[in-house]
Amino acid sequence: LFERPQGGERAVLVRLILEGSEDPQEFAEFQELASAAGAECVALISGRRSAPDPRLFAGSGKAAEIREAAQAGAAALVIFDHALSPSQERNLEAFLQCRVIDRTGLILDIFAQRARSFEGKLQVELAQLRHLSTRLVRGWTHLERQRGGIGLRGPGETQLETDRRLLADRIRQIRLRLDRVEKQREQGRRARRKADLPTVSVVG
């Protein structure tokens, strides 16, 4: 469902030092997270800002530097070690002409790769969907590619409305599945408690 970093996917890593947030070890941790997600770092971009730029987070000058690094390294992905707003993510993707994910998306991706149980995978997908729901405006074409596209749209719906409906449907389905898993677990606990009760025989 998600366009996550593939093994060896070339990426530019961006971490800005904002006022009061300087910690050299955090950049090393960020690189380790990106590597764990399967990204191949082709460039590290850093800089200082007193506060994030409302439009491009890094500012137009730094964003231009990021774009040049992505083009030079043939990177189709830029990962920010910050939480980006939906509008910042959209603006950056339009400016950089490549996919952008923030720290939250990166961590959710790692969780998704490492989830083993059925319930764990559902919980991670639900978190990813909620994260994605605020970013629908950029055009969710990969969902149509995976599910066929034709026949999905309702009468008079715009693509954005279709995407939102499909997203809401999927979230609802996952919640129902998680509810069933929880009920099955509770039934199992009750059965085990019942099995542990001592059996008393009365001889008369």
Which positions does each model-derived feature cover?
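N-terminal accessory targeting/assembly segments
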Residues: L1-D109
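Conserved G1/Walker A P-loop phosphate-binding module
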Residues: F2-A11, G139-G204
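Conserved hydrophobic/aromatic pocket- or pore-lining residues that grip, position, or stack substrates
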Residues: V78, L129, L167
